[in-house]
């Protein structure tokens, strides 16, 4: 999400994140990345904190992710990991069933 020349921010599944979440995380990023925490770990931590703040479960954050070196590498590492918003239920199953999600789980994730 940190690359201005593309990257994951261009994925339909991430619509809105580059403007909303990035703006919220920018002061933290400027202060702590990369010396204290990677961008990837910061985003994971932020997602877990947001989940708990909204009444969801507390999720343990595991640290140690390594940031992609450029926008091309960040895109290549994510291809096929997130669903395309304009595809149907078979596409969602292709993405989530291999990760152990049931149809019920997929519906909950999809909102």
Describe the residue ranges of each PLM region.
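Soluble secreted/lumenal catalytic domains
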Residues: 1-111
């Amino acid at each position: 999400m940190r690359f201005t020349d593309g990257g994951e921010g261009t994925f339909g599944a991430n619509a809105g994140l580059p403007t909303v979440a990035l703006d919220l995380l920018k002061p933290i990023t400027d202060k702590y990345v990369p010396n204290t925490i990677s961008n990837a770990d910061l985003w994971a931590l932020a997602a877990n904190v947001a989940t708990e703040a909204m009444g969801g479960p507390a999720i343990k954050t595991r640290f140690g992710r390594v940031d992609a070196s450029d926008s091309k590498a960040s895109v290549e590492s994510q291809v096929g990991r997130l669903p395309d918003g304009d595809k149907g239920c078979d596409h969602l199953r292709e993405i989530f069933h291999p990760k152990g999600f049931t149809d019920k789980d997929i519906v909950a994730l999809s909102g």
